[in-house]
């Protein structure tokens, strides 16, 4: 599970990504690219706050995004339109699902079902 960098430390993510990929390659492990999704989400939808007030831990939206990435990675299926969105606004949920799907598709170079 590739984590994300802190909100106020923009260069942290690239270092984390490098080390997660190195460790996974050395040990033949699957990487769930949650950090990659956070990076894309922060760049493409900065209006969606993925962090709690400590700028480190995920907000409800960040948790939803990470869970969507886990689902798409493990099942190879799109998350778009999944109805289990909890307290997240539907318009925000669809954006986060699209971020998760795009991240997983590009990270693994696959087409989600």
Give short role names for the model-derived ranges:
Residues 1-9:
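Surface-exposed cleft-lining segments at the edges of enzyme active sites
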Residues 10-103:
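Catalytic His-Asp segment of secreted/periplasmic serine-dependent ester chemistry enzymes
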Residues 102-113:
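Long, charge-rich low-complexity segments
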């Amino acid at each position: 599970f590739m984590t994300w960098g802190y909100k106020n430390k923009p260069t942290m993510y690239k270092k984390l990504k490098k080390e997660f990929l190195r460790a996974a390659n050395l040990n033949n492990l699957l990487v769930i690219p949650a950090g990659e999704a956070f990076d894309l989400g922060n760049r493409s939808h900065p209006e969606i706050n993925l962090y709690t007030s400590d700028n480190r831990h995920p907000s409800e939206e960040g948790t939803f995004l990470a869970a969507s990435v886990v689902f798409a990675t493990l099942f190879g299926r799109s998350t778009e339109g999944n109805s289990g969105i909890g307290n997240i606004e539907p318009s925000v949920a669809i954006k986060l699902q699209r971020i998760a799907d795009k991240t997983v598709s590009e990270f693994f170079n696959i087409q989600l079902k």
